Amino acid sequence: MDYSLCELCPRSCGVDRTAGERGFCGCPDTALVAKTMLHRWEEPALAGSGGSGAVFFGGCTLGCRYCQNAAISGGPTGTPVDSEGLRRIFEDLIAQGAENIDLVTPTQFLPTILSALTPKLPVPVVYNCGGYERAETIRQLEGKVDIYLPDLKYADSALGQSLSGAADYFPAACGAIREMVRQTGRPRWNGDKMVRGTIIRHLILPGQVENSLRVLDWIGENFAPGQVLVSLMRQYTPMGGLAAPFDRRVTEDEYEAVLSWMYLNRLEGFTQEAESADAGFIPDFQQGG
């Protein structure tokens, strides 16, 4: 795995980033760190009392039109760091009391990250990604990552294309998530803190209840009860510039319909309050750290 023939994500651009070529994500061959923080808004099983040691990387392999982190994901932004510098960032967050190291949108910089994760850290490593991954890439993370936190955004290929430019999102994400669960097995705990396992996130989109039901159906059909956890999110926040129905928040009826389907599929996990759909919960990427 390297940057010289980049096939880290399903777009498989094949560019030589070491020679200055750029693919879809626009990123160089040096990791870009946009922000670090003790993140207390992750799922309770991850945030604990100390917070997740979140490392937000610049750029993204998806480019969702409604992204809350567009300030950093829309282009290659952040401070360049090599693997040694990234290791120091991890260790500093742990010294501050981080419950884990939360790698946020990391795929485009995996070669650097993998080097920084050796030797193994004394806290769990969380791979927090958009779900648009290659199973072959995820396979190379075995033994390095303890907790996978992928999105499963779309079961509808037209929706994946229109909102993220990825008509192949669903098959790619499904294959990657199967590999994640193969590696982690069922969730493992230390008290109320997860130390190993896979949490599948799904963000309900306005006007797209059917998409959400299909996503939950797939999870229920492919994993035994309790084998994975589901984090059902209602935090969609209109960011401007999108036509209806994406110019509004998710309604209570939409949320309740999806929540009922989650329970019908005997899926365990986490849910959110309506107050989460507020721009105040988006990290401030203009601040230092």
Located regions from the model:
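Hydrophobic faces of well-ordered beta-strands that scaffold small-molecule active sites
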Residues: 53, 101, 125-127, 148-150, ...
